[in-house]
Amino acid sequence: MTICALTGKPLQTPIYQSQGSLSVTSLSQTYEGKTVVYFNEEIGHIQTKEIENIDVYYDKQYKFFNQSDEDDILYKVVDGKKIFRQEHQVNTLLSKINFEDEMQVLDYGCAKGTVMKRLGLQKPSVETYLFDVSQMYVNLWEQFLPSDHYASYQTKEEWHEKFDVVTSFFAFEHTPDPVKELRNINTLLKDGGHFYCIVPNVFENTGDFIVADHVHHYSDASLRYLFAKAGFETVEIDVSSHFGAYIAIGKKVSQKSLEFQINSIDLANVVNAAQETANYWNTLQDKICQFEQSVSGQKAAIYGAGVYGSFIATCLNNLDDIQCFIDQNPLLHGTTTFNKSIIPNSELPTEIKVIYVGLNPKIAQQVVSGFPKWQETVSSILFL
């Protein structure tokens, strides 16, 4: 039986199960096993069954572009300029939090620690600290912080009520027990301190729904519920400053749970959105397979080497027709996925006649409209 990590109550029938034996992770890698997703209608929270040995996975196997502190995920392209995710995260953080001299900030679930490194460069009077559940990134941390400013596995005892701000960038979707983690963060903050958190918005970036290693898919309602349960007053939940994500800011007001009443209209909207998302993914694999049959034997490519493109690859019965993946992220060019080369769009071979577009459906049409070359050479395009 699967238990809701936020309420402690049993979750009943799944709203989604992947059809094949392979699932996709948030790093666009494959995972042997099914993705099983549940929905708690009481608080509007989507929860995925944990992968096996999840603690070991994050300690030893979850390698978030850890070769260097420069590797990153492409966030968006504006007027031809590539903007990367961690760059955008720092700029958004600075627009939301007023960092004063000698403030102390901890990044909880920091991975490479790049956000705090960049924050320290822009705000050298702010003291930065790091915590993660792995030691894989220590070689990067020690390049810019002394050893008493970072910790792995457990936070330091001397950090009790030390921090003015605790941040968490795309970590709380991974943790099996977010209530436990946020209560621990409560003990690390000074009274009145702020928790600044970014998590995926599954209703804007629907690909988050099917990744095997994201245990939690929050809504506005379930974020407010989580904050209240850990003694935080919700200051803001912003759905627009970071595409496909919630920016949630809470203020520590108590060490105990707070009373919280979910708005019934907001909850009804979340229920409808969750059902629509589940229906979409429950039918998508059949759509991909039908398209594959209709273009069988033609040379094809998958546009997008991220979650959506990887999902397409796991659905195909035969990858022989796939010649390559196309992606705009220059950090991926020259690498491979599913034993296929990842190339820039400018190098698309003219013999490619079929393209599977592995992008967020909300932006896919707009992105592809900027590729006039496709109209000349490509005969069949699948949008998810």
Ranges and model annotations:
Residues V179-H194:
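A short glycine-rich, Lys/Arg-flanked "PGG" loop and its adjoining helix->strand segment in the class I
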Residues K251-L384:
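Hydrophobic, well-ordered beta-alpha structural blocks that scaffold small-molecule cofactor pockets
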Residues F169-P176:
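Short catalytic micro-motifs in class I SAM-dependent methyltransferases
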Residues L130, H174, C197:
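Conserved SAM-binding loop
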Residues S125-V126, G193, Q375-S379:
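A short helix->loop->beta-strand "cap" motif at the edges of active sites that frequently abuts
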Residues Q19-S21, Y196-L226:
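Short, glycine-/aromatic-enriched active-site segment of Class I SAM-dependent methyltransferases
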Residues P14-S18, F232-F243:
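Conserved S-adenosyl-L-methionine
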